[in-house]
């Protein structure tokens, strides 16, 4: 839906047309409970007028003193029975209402999380979609239930209103219709405020995300050291307050408008009600109606006033919530990663990868990130990818792993175009350690087992991969068990150093029985000895498989069978270390720069190579 600032009838009708979609969603999630609540709401709506009529008869029988005591007692007991029944229905309805709220909240959250997990990486890198996700998740805990609650409340109020109007019309039809005029007129203005409120929240989704981020870094451990060291607390608090202050001003303005409109509405309704009550009292004095009738008409007026207000508020709530629900539907209808359909599964290990004239451009960017990439990788090869920042190394890996779709050219896996492959079976053949690897605030077993989720309970294999990555810190502390909570977010969590987290992430990658291993800047959090151990393990595990690693340090790249040199999205050199020193000026410059950075140039280089070669 295109967002506009002026309320138009066609927009109102469009929003209200979302109702069938909302009912369909409700029926899909909780059909049985919803129908029960509607039935209870109808019964609840009828009971007030039934109770009112019985009380009228009771008062009239007492005033006239013409009826037998037994009849009066019968009417009284009937009144009590209706009251008890009304309370029973109310409590049962509250129970189902609470149950419905819990179920619908959990199921919708699950639906949104499932949808998020089915989106492509490019969607999470798109600010527009990220804002849409922010709007949806921010209000999902109450907005969908709010619209359902409004429907139920409106059903109850509508039944009560109709029965009350019918009761009053049996006395004075013309006067009764006056009670409906003001709510109908007021409804338009309430809807206009509702739209204004929605658009305010819609526009500030980006700022909401910024304020959440500031709050996040102020309240979590990963940023604590820099916040203290650079004394950022006051700056960030002020930045947060500036954002929230503008929100408070906007919300106060809306609140002021709502309060003023409510005041005008209540005064008008009370005046009309007073006129009707005055007419009823005069009719009683004239002997046209009895005292019990006057009391019941006064209560009927009150019921009409209250429930017309309730209906109007419910319509406002439905309209306002439907604006949100439209955002939810837009998110749920986002295009997902292509269905696997009848695509070909990988039935054997990956033995060849071929990039044929592959180019890639990020959305909303004019220049290609990768340009005409042609390269082949084969089983038994360990390949290093080097190049300056922004040269396209990580984009190459994201295309290879299927996280991005190829725009131009083809990637062939075992001779099959990657677009024709079943991506789940393909990704099952890949084990990767990304530079921004996950630190799951979960158990040690989960942190490792996520590498092969169907083997999560194979702790013997976990012991093996921990030995492979030489996670000695786990052996030296008897307190580390597979059910040990890692991180500090939850109770009894154990925090790890950056290098220890990386070893756990490496164990997760090696837990998978893959045929293509990828390491993205594996030395970023490791000391030289741990770095040497990491590459020893990598070269050992990737034997007879395909191994790829990105590195800024040529001392590790020298050990690869081949080195791919990238610059400005292009491959500018492929070969061994010695070959590239002769044929690739950029590689030679990188090698000279690395040696220059070592104060003991020649000795340092020899020491590093000796360390890597054992």
From Swiss-Prot:
It comes from Bacillus subtilis. One of its GO terms (biological process) is protein transport. CDD domains: ABCC_MRP_Like. Probably implicated in the export process of the lantibiotic subtilin. Residues 34-320 form the ABC transmembrane type-1 domain. This is Subtilin transport ATP-binding protein SpaT. GO terms for cellular component: plasma membrane. The gene is spaT. The chain crosses the membrane at residues 34-54, 69-89, 147-167, 175-195, 267-287. GO terms for molecular function: ABC-type transporter activity; ATP binding; ATP hydrolysis activity; ATPase-coupled lipid transmembrane transporter activity. It is found in: Cell membrane. ATP binds at residues 387-394. It is a multi-pass membrane protein. Keywords: ATP-binding, Bacteriocin transport, Cell membrane, Membrane, Nucleotide-binding, Protein transport, Transmembrane, Transmembrane helix, Transport. Residues 353-593 form the ABC transporter domain. Belongs to the ABC transporter superfamily. Its main location: membrane. SMART domains: AAA (SM00382).
């Amino acid at each position: 839906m295109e967002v506009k600032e002026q309320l138009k009838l066609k927009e109102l009708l469009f929003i209200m047309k979302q109702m069938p979609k909302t009912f369909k969603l409700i029926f899909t999630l909780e059909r049985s409970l919803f129908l029960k609540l509607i039935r209870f709401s109808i019964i609840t709506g009828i009971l007030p007028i039934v109770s009112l009529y019985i009380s009228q008869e009771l008062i009239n029988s007492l005033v006239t003193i013409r009826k037998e005591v037994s009849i009066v007692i019968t009417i009284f007991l009937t009144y009590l029975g209706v009251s008890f029944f009304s309370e029973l229905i109310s409590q049962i309805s509250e129970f189902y209402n609470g149950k419905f709220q819990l179920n619908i909240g959990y199921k919708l959250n699950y639906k949104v999380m499932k949808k998020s997990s089915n989106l492509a990486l490019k969607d999470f890198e798109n600010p527009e979609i990220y804002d849409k996700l922010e709007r949806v998740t921010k209000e999902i805990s109450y907005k969908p239930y709010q619209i359902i609650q409004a429907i139920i409340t409106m059903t109850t109020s509508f039944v009560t209103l109709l029965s009350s109007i019918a009761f009053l019309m049996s006395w004075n039809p013309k006067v009764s219709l006056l009670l409906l005029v003001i709510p109908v007129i007021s409804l338009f203005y309430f809807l206009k405020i509702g739209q204004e409120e929605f658009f305010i929240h819609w526009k500030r989704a980006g700022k909401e995300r910024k304020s959440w981020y500031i709050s996040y870094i102020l309240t979590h451990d990963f940023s604590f050291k820099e916040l203290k060291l650079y004394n950022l607390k006051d700056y960030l608090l002020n930045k947060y307050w500036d954002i929230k202050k503008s929100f408070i001003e906007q919300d106060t303005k809306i609140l002021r408008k709502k309060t003023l409109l409510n005041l005008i509405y209540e005064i008008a309704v009370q005046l009309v009600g007073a006129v009707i009550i005055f007419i009823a009292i005069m009719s009683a004095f004239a002997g046209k109606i009895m005292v019990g009738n006057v009391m019941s008409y006064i209560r009927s007026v009150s019921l009409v006033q209250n429930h017309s207000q309730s209906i109007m508020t419910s319509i406002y709530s439905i309209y306002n919530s439907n604006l949100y629900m439209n955002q939810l539907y837009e998110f749920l209808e986002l295009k997902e990663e292509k269905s696997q359909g009848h695509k070909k599964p990988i039935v054997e290990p990956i033995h060849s990868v071929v990039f044929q004239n592959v180019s890639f451009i990020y959305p909303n960017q004019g220049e290609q990130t990768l340009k005409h990439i042609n390269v082949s990788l084969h089983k038994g090869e360990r390949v290093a990818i080097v190049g300056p920042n922004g040269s396209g190394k990580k984009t190459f890996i994201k295309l290879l792993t299927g996280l991005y779709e190829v725009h131009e050219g083809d990637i062939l896996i075992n001779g099959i175009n990657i677009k024709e492959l079943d991506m789940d079976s393909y990704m099952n053949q890949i084990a990767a350690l990304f530079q921004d690897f996950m630190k799951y605030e979960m158990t040690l077993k989960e942190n490792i087992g996520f590498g092969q989720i169907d083997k999560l309970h194979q702790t013997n294999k976990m012991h093996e991969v921990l030995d492979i990555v030489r996670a000695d810190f786990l052996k030296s502390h008897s307190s580390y068990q597979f059910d040990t909570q890692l991180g500090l977010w939850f109770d009894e969590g154990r925090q790890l150093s950056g290098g220890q987290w990386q070893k756990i992430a490496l164990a997760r990658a090696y837990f998978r029985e893959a045929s293509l291993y990828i390491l993205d800047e594996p030395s970023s959090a490791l000391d030289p000895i741990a770095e040497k151990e990491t590459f020893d393990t990598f070269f050992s595990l990737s034997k007879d498989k395909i191994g790829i690693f990105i590195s800024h340090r040529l001392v590790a790249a020298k050990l690869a069978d081949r080195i791919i040199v990238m610059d400005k999205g292009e491959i500018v050199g492929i070969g061994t270390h010695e070959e590239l020193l002769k044929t690739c000026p950029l590689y030679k410059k990188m090698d000279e720069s690395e040696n220059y950075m070592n104060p003991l140039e020649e000795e340092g280089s020899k020491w590093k190579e000796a360390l890597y070669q054992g």
